[in-house]
Amino acid sequence: MDNIRNIVFDFDGTLMDTAPLILGTMKATIEKLGLEPHTDEEYRATIGLRLEEIPAALWQATPEVGKLYAATYRRIFNELKQSFQIECFPGVIDTLKLLNADGYRMAIASSRNRKSLQEYVDSFDISDCFTMLVGGDDVFQGKPAPDPVLKILGSCGWKATETITVGDASVDILMGRAAGTATCAVTYGNGTMEELLSSEPTFMTDTFNALRPIVRGVNPEIVKYVEHSIIPRYDDFDKAHRRDHVRMVIDQSLCLLRRLPELNIDMAYCIATFHDLGLVDGREKHHIASGKILESDSFIRTYFTEQQIDIMKEAVEDHRASGKTKPRSLYGMVVADADRFIEAETIIRRTI
């Protein structure tokens, strides 16, 4: 994944949690038109299609019904949207800004019309992160056809081989694959696991935060293990050392690695994720305990050599910003500097 320079995102269910508003609007539209009701799961399965295509998917309806449905939906949507609080999924805004700072070029390919898409992007102050927005009304064929991604690639001059498409539904993954890009399915949105697996994405992730390590080239299996088995352990620590802290250390470590391309990114990532786990035994010697936890981790031992594990253990032990001795390796310097970088933001919390 070290060749990835461009990222194309889906919007609904990937960046923003719009499902309550969409489902509410769908149900009101269906009732208004006297159509046969379906289950929420069946409604969710149509998110990602253009509005005009939904009646055909749910009721095998004619194109004329599709046009009527779309017009009714848009009118009801505008009436209801002020009643729903739309939020970004956890980690979206921070990760987008970090990816932007990393130099990745980003765009959105959505089935919603571009005016609505632009309004939401502007409302969350993330428009500067994107080179281009493509709505369902900008292309002749919508998802799962490749047209939205191809329009972005052509307009921006991006290569498909340097691009990854990220989405929560099978139509997003199929769109990206048809356009020749790598793909990443996020599992927290509207698509079911069965649907996502059947679309054969290049990668899958349960959290948006994990996307940055993946596109930076960290082994996706390591990212998955860390997200499921390591980061949740920070929930038991004091307020200054919970998930937000370890994620900041990870993010800052990845930033520092831009200037140190000779370092192994998998090693640096794991060092950052393990650096404070020793707090489970108290703060005084937590850096030593953290090193032992990393060294004895069975998953880590399947991915790294003994020499690499020794270096990683030393780096974890050397991470303390208040330590009097110089880190023994560049890896130790990276995690120490990453931890020290955020110290100013957390020093007050750490002394309470």
Residue ranges and their predicted role:
Residues N3, E79-I108, R114-Q118, P146:
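Short, acidic loop-to-helix structural element flanking the phosphoryl-transfer center
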Residues I47-L80, P90-I93, K97-L98:
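A metal-dependent, Asp-based hydrolase signature
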